[in-house]
Structure formats: structure tokens, C-alpha cells
From Swiss-Prot:
Its EC number is 1.14.-.-. Involved in the metabolism of insect hormones and in the breakdown of synthetic insecticides. This is Cytochrome P450 4d2. One of its GO terms (molecular function) is heme binding. It comes from Drosophila melanogaster. Its main location: endoplasmic reticulum. Belongs to the cytochrome P450 family. It is found in: Endoplasmic reticulum membrane; Microsome membrane.
């Protein structure tokens, strides 16, 4: 009897090996890449790899296998590219808009919002949200950028002694959180003055937990995470409930306000208790929108508001923090920025800025663009192929995860001379143009960042506000890039501040 069982087990094992070989053969002949092991694929390559090593790992593979290569993670085929031709083919397509499996990590928080949805649902939501970034609404948002940046300056005054390194990342994080809450939900959460508020703490808790799950691949599988990390799973669920409850309460309150208002009054015509015209927020647009004649449900709206809260504070925090770091390390750039700010905004540091003012800060825009090149907030972009795809004559089967190494591409010497140097003049109008998909810090194509104009205005407003009040000093250690959900620094982003006379 035991002999029969042994034979059956041996046959089963041999069948699995044969299936494994045949399954992988469909991908191994496509592109160059490391030789996979049975069952495990190339999983062992990632053993011990921490977030600070990921980009060097991608560069090493690129040197060895070329700009387009494949790896196997268990039985999942993954293709990597750092070639703008491949990236253009994928990102410009209306068919390949499904995010790859890694993004599923965010489902617990964001649900099926604009970042996560695909197909007809994504098209419908994108069409609804696009008007939120119309010129007239952005103009109203600039006032919020300016006011919340002023709070940031006030909070930093006591720390600006000209000799103490400040980790600017958490400071900018709270500022960005205040800005996105007021612009997306139309409500002030005062995160900068009350960083221990339950909602603010919940955002920080979930972000930190998701970062850990991103780093440890096995924790990305939800049931494994809950089985092996039950305390963290409960903490994550509790924090998500706090955020969802908060957003849902805001939605209910705003919906009731709209219902109770006169039918003749539009949100643009509403005024507050001071007699000032009420600003439109993303939430107002969503509450008044319909898809196929039906209004969005509260859950639909919550997904979109939560998506904006995530994308509007984490990526912006990364972008602004690294930009301030670069300015602090390049005094000639800082001096030129100061002159431009005086020329455009004047000498009165308390005077509010306008949308037109921010548009005239041309050199600052170059500085921000160059910082985004060196420190892209989203270092990788992923897609999942629902059908067979041919890229440069290479057949790639359906079910493949396709990852675009934006961080590596933006430092490629073929497209950027002296790529590790900070040179804002790269973006001067008279500089010869490079491949349009070689510089895509906001992604590109139909799924590009819908809020990139919003983000650029927010960055200009925040950076200019700091420079009007402080000199940025090169204090503290150099940041160590850490590839998480967004680009961070493992040791913070440090600089010094000295009040301007």
C-alpha cells in the first residue's frame, strides 16, 4: 500500500514539475532574464532585499539583461522596462489601463476609486472628476494653499535657529494633509496644529502599515498578513474604520446641506457666515454627479475622496520635501529663486499669492521639475495585461504584470546628461526635447495623474512661502532613497532654516 502511495506521490510531483516547466516556457523564451527555479521562480533573488536596495537591483538587472527583461515570482510572470518606447506603448494605450497586482494592497483603504478602478467604471469616474481641476476651481484652491502654507511657516518659526537639522518630511506631510482635506472634502482638519487627532493618526497608522506590507512581499497576501500579523491587522482595520467613518460623516453632512438649500442656489453661489462665496470642493462635484442618470452612492463618493486624500498628501509630501532638500544644497539656485519670488510676489511676505502669480514662477517650475526627475514620488508604475501583447516584436502573454522603472529611467545618461547632477536648466524652453516618455514623473497617457496641475500649484505655493520667510541651509545627513508605495527617505529629509532679515 505504501509503495502505491509513494508511486502516486512521485507521479504527482513529476506532473507538477512538467507543468511548471511548460508553464514557464511560455515566458522564458520571450525575453532575457534570470533562470527560474522550479515552483519558486526567481523569488530567492528578492530574499533580504530592502527598500533602499530596490533601484540598484533594477539597475543591475538592466545592465545584465537589457532595458526589457522578465522575472518569475512563483508562477507570476513579471516584465520590467526602463525603455521609453515600451513605456509609451503601454501608457498611451486605451486597452492596457488595469493596474498591476501590487496596487491591490490599497484596496482595503481606497476601495474601487479612481486609482484602483478599471474599464467602464474608471472611464465614468475620470469623466466626473476632471472638471474639478478646471481653472476657476483651481483658482479657489490657491487661497487654501497659501493659508495652510502660512500655518506651516508659523509652526516652523520656533525651530528656525540656523543650526539645528529639521526633518522636513513630517512637517510637509501635515501641511499637505490640511490642504487636501480642505480641497477634497471642504473641511478643515487642522492637522498641523493637532497632529494627534484620530483621523490624522489613522492616516499615519495605515500608511506605515501598508509600507511594511509593501516591503515584505508575503504580507501583501491579505490572509497571510492576518494570520501572521494579527495585531497589525486589527490596528489597520481600526484605523481604516476611523478614516471611513470620518469621510462618511462629512459626506452625509454635505449632502444634507445641499438638499436643504434652495433649488435656485448653486454651490458656486453659496456664501459662508462672513458673506464670502463658498469654495467648491471635490466632494461637491461628486455629490452632484451622475453616471448613466444615477447619482453616485455614498460608498462611491467615499472611495474617491479617500483616493484623493491618499494621493494628495503622500506623493505631494515626497515631492515637496525632496525639492526643499535640493534647494538647501544649491545656494546659487536658492538665490535665483529668491530673486524671482521678489520680482513676481513683491517684498511683502504676507501678501497672498494668486493663480497668475504662481504661473509666472518659471524658474521655480524648472527647479521642481528637476527635483521630480531626481526624486520621482512614484518610482515605478505598473500595469496588468488582460490580453496577449507584442512589444518590440516580443510576445508577452496575458496575465503578465508589467512594471515601468521610472526612477531608473529618469537617471538614464542616454536621456539626461550627467544624470545625478541637479540642473534645473535642463527644462529651459530652448533646450532640445527628449523622448516624451523619458520624463513622466506624473505618469502619462489616459491614466496620467489627474491632479498634476493641482500638485504643481501646491508645490509652488508651499516652496515659495518657505523661501519668503526662511533661508534653507544644508544641515543634516543626505537622504537615503527608500522605495515604498511612494518614494521616501529611510533617514528622513533634513535641512536647516534661518529666518530672513
Amino acid at each position: 500500500m505504501l509503495g502505491v502511495v509513494g508511486v502516486l506521490l512521485l507521479v504527482a510531483f513529476a506532473t507538477l514539475l512538467l507543468w511548471d516547466f511548460l508553464w514557464r516556457r511560455r515566458g522564458n523564451g520571450i525575453l532575457p532574464g534570470p533562470r527560474p527555479l522550479p515552483f519558486l521562480g526567481n523569488l530567492l533573488m528578492y530574499r533580504g532585499l530592502d527598500p533602499e536596495q530596490i533601484m540598484d537591483f533594477v539597475k543591475k538587472n538592466q545592465r545584465k539583461y537589457g532595458r526589457l527583461y522578465r522575472v518569475w515570482i512563483l508562477h507570476q510572470l513579471a516584465v520590467f522596462s526602463t525603455d521609453p518606447r515600451d513605456i509609451e506603448f503601454v501608457l498611451s494605450s486605451q486597452q492596457h489601463i488595469t493596474k498591476n497586482n501590487l496596487y491591490k494592497l490599497l484596496n482595503c483603504w481606497l476601495g474601487d476609486g479612481l486609482l484602483m478602478s478599471t474599464g467602464r467604471k474608471w472611464h465614468g469616474r475620470r469623466k466626473i472628476i476632471t472638471p474639478t481641476f478646471h481653472f476657476k476651481i483651481l483658482e479657489q484652491f490657491v487661497e487654501i494653499f497659501d493659508q495652510q502654507s502660512a500655518v506651516m511657516v508659523e509652526q516652523l518659526q520656533s525651530r528656525a535657529d540656523g543650526k539645528t537639522p529639521i526633518n522636513i518630511f513630517p512637517v510637509i506631510c501635515l501641511t499637505a494633509l490640511d490642504i487636501i482635506a480642505e480641497t477634497a472634502m471642504g473641511t478643515k482638519i487642522n492637522a498641523q496644529k493637532n497632529p494627534n487627532l484620530p483621523y490624522v493618526q489613522a492616516v499615519n497608522d495605515v500608511t506605515n502599515i501598508l509600507i511594511k506590507r509593501f516591503i515584505h512581499a508575503w504580507q501583501r497576501v491579505d490572509w497571510i498578513f492576518r494570520l501572521t500579523q494579527p495585531t497589525e491587522a486589527k490596528r489597520q482595520d481600526k484605523a481604516i474604520k476611523v478614516m471611513h467613518d470620518f469621510t462618511e460623516n462629512i459626506i452625509r453632512e454635505r449632502r444634507e446641506t445641499l438638499v436643504n438649500n434652495s433649488k435656485e442656489t448653486t454651490p458656486e453661489e453659496e456664501v459662508n457666515f462672513l458673506g464670502q462665496k463658498r469654495r467648491m470642493a471635490l466632494l461637491d462635484v461628486l455629490l452632484q454627479s451622475t453616471i448613466d442618470g444615477a447619482p453616485l452612492s455614498d460608498e462611491d463618493i467615499r472611495e474617491e475622496v479617500d483616493t484623493f486624500m491618499f494621493e494628495g498628501h503622500d506623493t505631494t509630501t515626497s515631492a515637496i520635501s525632496f525639492c526643499l532638500y535640493e534647494i538647501s544644497r544649491h545656494p546659487e539656485v536658492q538665490q535665483r529663486l529668491q530673486q524671482e519670488i521678489r520680482d513676481v510676489l513683491g517684498e511683502d511676505r504676507k501678501s497672498p499669492v494668486t493663480l497668475r502669480d504662481l504661473g509666472e514662477l518659471k524658474f521655480m517650475e524648472n527647479v521642481i521639475k528637476e527635483s521630480l526627475r531626481l526624486h520621482p514620488p512614484v518610482p515605478m508604475i505598473g500595469r496588468w495585461f488582460a490580453e496577449d501583447v507584442e512589444i518590440r516584436g516580443k510576445h508577452i502573454p496575458a496575465g503578465t504584470n508589467f512594471t515601468m522603472g521610472i526612477f531608473v529611467l529618469l537617471r538614464d545618461p542616454e536621456y539626461f546628461e550627467s544624470p545625478d547632477e541637479f540642473r534645473p536648466e535642463r527644462f529651459d524652453a530652448d533646450v532640445p526635447q527628449i523622448h516624451p516618455y523619458a520624463y513622466i514623473p506624473f505618469s502619462a497617457g489616459p491614466r496620467n495623474c489627474i491632479g498634476q496641475k493641482f500638485a504643481m500649484l501646491e508645490m509652488k505655493s508651499t516652496v515659495s512661502k518657505l523661501l519668503r520667510h526662511f533661508e534653507l541651509l544644508p544641515l543634516g545627513p543626505e537622504p537615503r532613497h527608500s522605495m515604498n508605495i511612494v518614494l521616501r527617505s529611510a533617514n528622513g529629509v533634513h535641512l536647516g532654516l534661518k529666518p530672513r532679515a
